[in-house]
């Protein structure tokens, strides 16, 4: 049985943080003046100090990494590093004067002046409070990566450059993890960083060809994970081989008006039909025959007994539960607690959860050993990614549903919003889902314990 617990990552209220005048000073040649050092093993909480430590480490990281990746030295930033706020002077950036309205709640690299600037009043304190120090470091690493691109003369579409910057940021996060406690990836730090990237994703429906495109949440988290897993060398290949961008347009004005979401009662029948067709085709490729799932049933945890194979499921195990009952060949989901939470995220959050239950049914039919809950869960997440890719590519026989903008992001948001009992993090679940989406079913088997 799978029971989910609601996590606070994406439901934290916005609370204003009091800000004081910065004690940081910056040289025009890009050198950060010495400031307070964090004792070994101590984590910093003040956003200004977090930024300072991140920039110092990023300079050192790229001084050693750039010659290895691009066979050239990293030259210090000519314009340095400039924090700003609504009441402080803004840096110049080329011929166009900057105003706070333009750059509020933002961070940027200005190629014309070769400087990195950030809103230290209305961006970083909020990110720090909601998503933690690692996310603040990630934002600075992303902008630093743009300075690297400028020096390496990397050219490409805007979205390619932005995703490469996310990838380089992921490579730095993997490298800095054991060196600076403030940027440790232990616990839920990587999940919080993923939530931060989702916060900074493109608005729904922005095409990948747009001059302002940074990528969907799925695109950005995928690029970050590739850098984290495969290092800066993998990121450097983006210039010659741009990563795929999953930019899904709205299909109609009505689709845009609803944010691409269907009510669950309208979604269920075509979703089940697509799942049945998908798994029948997948089993056919394996030389097997798919046995359709008998039922999908929502239940009320407090509305009377729920049975599986004639045995009553304890009431305290039903709240926020979604499970596949082998004996009854039925996918069950808490229709009072879990279902409304999924629907609030978006229709494909529910679609992903039901696809996952179908994947568990597939494990049973294929005789896969699911005794390792964590491995079996990641395998199911991977197969969910394979299904999502088939929907996206319109490869399902007699397909009835088509993805809308934000659908893949809804899967990741659900991973972040709900914690399971098997110990897998949202970061790990997203990686498993991404592997299935990008590579198909082949890597899914490797996730089994």
Role assignments for model-derived ranges:
Residues 14-18:
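C-terminal motif of bacterial Sec signal peptides marking the signal peptidase cleavage site
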Residues 20-23:
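Bacterial signal peptide processing site
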Residues 40, 69-95, 164, 184-198, ...:
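Acidic helix-start/capping segments at beta-turn-to-alpha-helix junctions
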Residues 85-117, 298-332:
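Catalytic zinc-binding patch centered on the HExxH motif and its immediate surroundings
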Residues 144-159, 171-178, 358-372, 389-392:
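Catalytic Zn2+-binding segment of zinc metalloproteases
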Residues 205-286, 420-449:
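Pan-zinc metallopeptidase signature
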């Amino acid at each position: 049985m799978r029971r989910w617990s609601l996590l606070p990552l994406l439901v934290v209220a916005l609370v204003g943080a009091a800000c004081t005048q910065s004690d940081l000073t910056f040289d025009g040649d890009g050198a950060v003046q010495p400031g307070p050092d964090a004792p070994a093993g101590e984590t910093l909480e003040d956003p200004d100090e977090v930024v300072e430590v991140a920039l110092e480490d990023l300079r050192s990281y790229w001084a050693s990494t750039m010659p290895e990746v691009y066979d050239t030295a990293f030259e210090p930033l000519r314009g340095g590093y400039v924090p700003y706020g609504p009441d402080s002077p803004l840096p110049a950036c080329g011929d166009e004067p900057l105003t706070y309205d333009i750059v509020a709640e933002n961070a940027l690299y200005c190629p014309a002046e070769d400087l990195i600037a950030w809103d230290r009043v209305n961006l970083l304190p909020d990110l720090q409070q909601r998503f933690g120090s690692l996310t603040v470091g990630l934002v600075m690493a992303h902008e630093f990566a743009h300075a690297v691109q400028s020096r390496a003369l990397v050219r490409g579409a805007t979205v390619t450059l932005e995703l490469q910057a996310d990838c380089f940021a992921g490579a730095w996060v993997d490298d800095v993890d054991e060196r600076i406690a403030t940027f440790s990836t232990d616990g839920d730090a990587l999940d919080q960083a993923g939530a931060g990237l989702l916060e900074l994703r493109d608005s729904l429906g922005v095409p990948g060809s747009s001059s302002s495109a940074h990528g969907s949440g799925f695109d950005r988290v995928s690029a970050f994970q590739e850098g984290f897993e495969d290092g800066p060398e993998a990121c450097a290949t983006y210039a010659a081989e741009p990563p795929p961008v999953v930019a899904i347009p709205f299909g109609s004005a009505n689709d845009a008006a609803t944010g691409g979401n269907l009510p669950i009662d309208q979604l269920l029948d075509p979703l089940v039909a697509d799942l049945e067709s998908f798994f029948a085709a997948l089993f056919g490729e394996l030389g097997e025959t798919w046995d359709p799932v008998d039922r999908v049933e929502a239940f009320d945890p407090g509305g009377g007994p729920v049975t599986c194979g004639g045995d009553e499921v304890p009431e305290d195990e039903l709240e926020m539960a979604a499970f596949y009952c082998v004996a009854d060949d039925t996918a069950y989901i808490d229709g009072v607690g879990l279902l409304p939470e999924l629907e609030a995220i978006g229709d494909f959050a529910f679609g992903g959860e039901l696809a996952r239950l179908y994947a568990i049914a597939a494990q049973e039919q294929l005789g896969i050993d699911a005794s390792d809950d964590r491995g079996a869960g990641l395998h199911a997440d991977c197969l969910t990614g394979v299904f999502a890719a088939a929907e996206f590519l319109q490869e399902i026989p007699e397909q009835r549903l088509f993805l809308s903008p934000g659908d893949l992001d809804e899967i990741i948001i659900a991973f972040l919003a709900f914690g399971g009992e098997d110990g897998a993090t949202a970061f790990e679940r997203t990686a498993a889902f991404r592997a299935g989406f990008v590579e198909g079913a082949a890597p899914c088997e490797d996730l089994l314990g």
